[in-house]
Curated annotation (Swiss-Prot):
KW ATP-binding (keyword) present: no
Protein name: Putative 3-methyladenine DNA glycosylase
Similarity comment: family membership: Belongs to the DNA glycosylase MPG family.
Residue ranges, annotated region (Disordered): 189-209
CDD domains linked to this entry: AAG
Pfam family, one: Pur_DNA_glyco
Enzyme Commission designation: 3.2.2.-
Keyword Hydrolase: yes
Amino acid sequence: MKRLGADFYQMPTILLAERLLGKIFVHHEVSGRVTKGRIVETEAYLGDGDEACHAWRGMTERNHVMFGPPGHLYIYFSYGCHYLANIVSEQKGIAGAVLLRAMEPIEGIEWMQERRGTTDERALMSGPGKLTQALGLGPAHYGESLLGDICWLEEAPDIPPELIGTSPRIGISRSTDLLWRKFIAGSPYISKTQPGPPPKKRKKGLESS
């Protein structure tokens, strides 16, 4: 399949959250292993006015990659237990990223099962922490370009608007009224968590992207 180029990522974050649905995420590891997942669920985060976004108070050493250029990975450690992956959007200098919330396993499923400790394909990538574990993504991929030979996206037809579901984002306690979670309606691979704030015992952690 043809790889997506730089122009694809230079669009408004909310639009990118929709356009990413159906696209194929590829991780080509140094070992030669290749894992692929079809994106079925995303969430948009914007630095301007979105208090659930890591960049809403400005640039820091931690979030600087969110300010561009677009088409790079923003990886962070969440709630002390999971690495989450975001794709940087917008024009350079404007903070924005799309959280990859869930995928459908496509290739390298045996390695995903080994990493995740389950043979249930629907559970391999049905959450943002699950998919990074399945794909083998971690802190080493912070700032990784999606135009290189390690991680990239492959083209796939856009999902028709009538098949795109929308809801509030999951696991956040601020800016909860924004309907910036996008997903392929009816997909058995989307996350099962209900929109809304995280459980009280997890409030010491960081918000999603």
